[in-house]
Amino acid sequence: IGGEDNYEDYDVNYIPFDKTLGKFTKKKNLITENAKFDNIVYMHDYYILSNDWYQGFLKFGDNWDLCMNIIENKDGTRFRDWCVWDDPEFCFDTGNQRIVLPSYDYNKHKYMYISGGYWISKKYVMEREPLNENLDWGESEDVEWSKRVLPKYVYMMNEYSKVKLLKDKRLSAEVL
């Protein structure tokens, strides 16, 4: 990930990847295989960590399996962070399914999904439950994976840490 720049002065593991394969799921599974640490951040290149992101994690703690942070669009509005996919109370409007962003204290995890652009996981979770490499970006690979993992693991919202989008993205979710 990130290109072949000289990383000798940093603790970075460059992972070569044939871009013609085009599978985001394969790339993320390769990150898991090559990870040196227990906590792994999965994020697309259009996200950036806030300056106090790491301090927020130190304050939040390490008692989780899967974790999300606040995600902000360029204009400061919420983006797909604490996503609800199929809660009958919120997500169905005249028979159409919709994604909503509830308050951060929402805890009905069986109705949630983790958007594939950014999340944090313990390495053991991803080793036990890798992304389905038969699916790719835009094929609900994140929804399929979320529905497998969320019933089994502790998923928590860290409101002390924040990431921001480097480019404007359409929300496609209703903020409650």
Can you say where each PLM-predicted feature lies in the sequence?
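Active-site acidic short loop of glycosyltransferases
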Residues: 35-38, 131
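Acidic donor-binding loop at a coil-to-helix junction in glycosyltransferase catalytic cores
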Residues: 137-145
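Catalytic donor-sugar/metal-binding loop of nucleotide-sugar-dependent glycosyltransferases
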Residues: 146-163
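Conserved catalytic core of nucleotide-sugar-dependent glycosyltransferases
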Residues: 50-130
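Short beta-strand-to-loop acidic/aromatic patch adjacent to the donor-nucleotide binding site
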Residues: 37-48
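Nucleotide-sugar-dependent glycosyltransferase catalytic core
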Residues: 22, 78-87, 137-138, 164-176
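Glycine-rich, basic loop-to-helix element that forms the pyrophosphate-binding segment
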Residues: 18-35
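Acidic donor-binding segment of Leloir-type glycosyltransferases
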Residues: 1-21
